[in-house]
Swiss-Prot record:
Keywords: Ribonucleoprotein, Ribosomal protein, RNA-binding, rRNA-binding, tRNA-binding. Gene3D superfamilies: Ribosomal protein L10e/L16. It holds the Pfam family Ribosomal_L16. Part of the 50S ribosomal subunit. GO terms for biological process: translation. Transmembrane segments: none annotated. It comes from Gloeobacter violaceus (strain ATCC 29082 / PCC 7421). Coiled coil: none annotated. This is Large ribosomal subunit protein uL16. Belongs to the universal ribosomal protein uL16 family. Binds 23S rRNA and is also seen to make contacts with the A and possibly P site tRNAs. GO terms for cellular component: cytosolic large ribosomal subunit. GO terms for molecular function: rRNA binding; structural constituent of ribosome; tRNA binding. The gene is rplP.
Amino acid sequence: MLMPKRTKFRKQQRGRMNGAACRGNEIEFGTYALQALEPVWMTSRQIEAARRAMTRYIRRGGKIYIRVFPDKPVTQRAAETRMGSGKGAPEYWVCVVKPGRILFEIDGVAEEIAREAMRLAAAKLPIKSRFIVKSETAPAEEPTNAPT
């Protein structure tokens, strides 16, 4: 499962998840992608389950890009512990996902295969998501400053 090799601090505060993703919201590597539509803390187990579902479906064709990484430790106290006596030990790792964030990308397969692989992956995730295709729009010609 995914987790950082080392971190500067063992524990983090929870923080908030307001607003849409302002980075990581465009397709960069592949042709097809799965985009989150809701905010969530996505665990490393969920990311791994989705990756396995996609890999199993597309077999040896194509390439999968995982665009999220769980870098936030979540702590838990032991059950039936009295209040106080500090924060619990880190139990698992999560990735803070905001709406609009690209989760996975696929390249090198047909659209039907990519769509089905993403559907299987989305079933493993706790949020609504959508399948998107990279738009092949050519950049507009820039106006020249030459006098006419």
